[in-house]
């Protein structure tokens, strides 16, 4: 099924589409899409990146789902780039990112769209994120700053924008060159940095996403590639006058030599909720 956006009154989501790349994992796709709970029809574009067997659109009330099949597996960067272009061709204004296995909170899309309608300079809007295990158990909460100035200042020091929680202004994404494969495994940070050169990015300071941390699915090769891409981005956009750029550079050099599981243990310890007395 192919869908096309139409003019949208404030209470509708007809100019918003959920953008989800998927490679295998039909059960995760089904779980994620079933989590959407909005007062209006939700449009979804699944970019099937060469899955075997192919991803099938589940039948869910209040969701209109299209599957766009890539001829072969080409990686998340290519899948997202293709998805953004496809949504633009269909007339959508906003792309709401999510990954298979993650879960949306009720009314996430409506809240994000309302904010972006009221703030036209904002090209990307994230939300706070609860990180959970594969079984759904809570690990820690990501509560990045809300204001664009703080996000711009801290962009290389901490994760200020949780990619699967983001709503993106499609014309702005395409204006800065769309997703690209120049920085493998750091395609999100690459896009956000380019967006922040011309627009603002912000966060709604409330829970919007349950993010599944699948530690077994992160290979040492992919993690090293991600850290190296992040370091290249830091050097490309380095601001010597911003102390947080220096802190971020040191932090990512540390990441390069520290085992992934050790970093996750530290993060859980620092970000886990404390018992009240």
Q: Language-model segments: which ranges?
A:
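Hydrophobic targeting segments
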Residues: 14-20, 35-36, 42-47
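Short, well-formed alpha-helical segments that are part of the catalytic scaffolds
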Residues: 24-38
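A conserved acidic beta->alpha catalytic loop
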Residues: 48-56, 72, 99-102
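Hydrophobic/aromatic residue at the end of a short beta strand that borders the catalytic acidic motif
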Residues: 98, 103-108, 131, 168, ...
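Glycine-rich, basic loop-to-helix element that forms the pyrophosphate-binding segment
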Residues: 70-90
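Conserved donor NDP-sugar-binding/catalytic core segment of glycosyltransferases
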Residues: 107-139
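Short aromatic/hydrophobic "clamp" motif used to bind/position activated sugar donors
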Residues: 95
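Conserved nucleotide-sugar donor-binding catalytic segment
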Residues: 21, 145-231
């Amino acid at each position: 099924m192919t869908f096309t956006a139409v003019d949208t009154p404030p209470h509708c989501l007809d100019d918003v589409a959920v953008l989800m790349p998927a490679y295998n994992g039909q059960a995760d796709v089904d779980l994620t899409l079933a989590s959407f709970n909005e007062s209006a029809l939700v449009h979804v574009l699944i970019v099937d990146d060469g899955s075997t067997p192919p991803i099938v659109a589940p039948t869910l009330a209040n969701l209109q789902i299209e599957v766009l099949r890539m001829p072969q597996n080409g990686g998340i960067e290519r899948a997202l780039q293709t998805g953004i272009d496809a949504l633009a061709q269909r007339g959508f204004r906003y792309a709401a990112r999510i990954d298979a296995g993650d879960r949306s909170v009720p009314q996430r899309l409506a809240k994000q769209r309302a904010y972006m309608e009221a703030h036209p300079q904002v090209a990307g809007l994230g939300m706070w994120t609860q990180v959970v295990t594969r079984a759904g158990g809570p690990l820690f909460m990501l509560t990045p700053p809300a204001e664009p100035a703080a996000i711009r200042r801290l962009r290389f020091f901490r994760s200020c924008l949780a990619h699967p929680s983001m709503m993106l202004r499609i014309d702005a994404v395409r204006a800065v060159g769309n997703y690209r494969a120049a920085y493998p495994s750091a395609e999100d940070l690459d896009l956000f940095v380019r967006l922040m050169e011309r627009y603002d990015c912000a966060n709604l300071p409330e829970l919007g996403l349950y993010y599944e941390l699948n530690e077994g699915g992160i290979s040492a090769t992919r993690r090293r590639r991600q850290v190296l891409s992040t370091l290249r981005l830091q050097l490309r956009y380095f601001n010597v006058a911003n102390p947080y750029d220096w802190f971020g550079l040191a932090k990512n050099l540390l990441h390069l030599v520290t085992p992934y599981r050790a970093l996750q243990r530290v993060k859980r310890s620092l970000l886990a909720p404390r018992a009240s007395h």
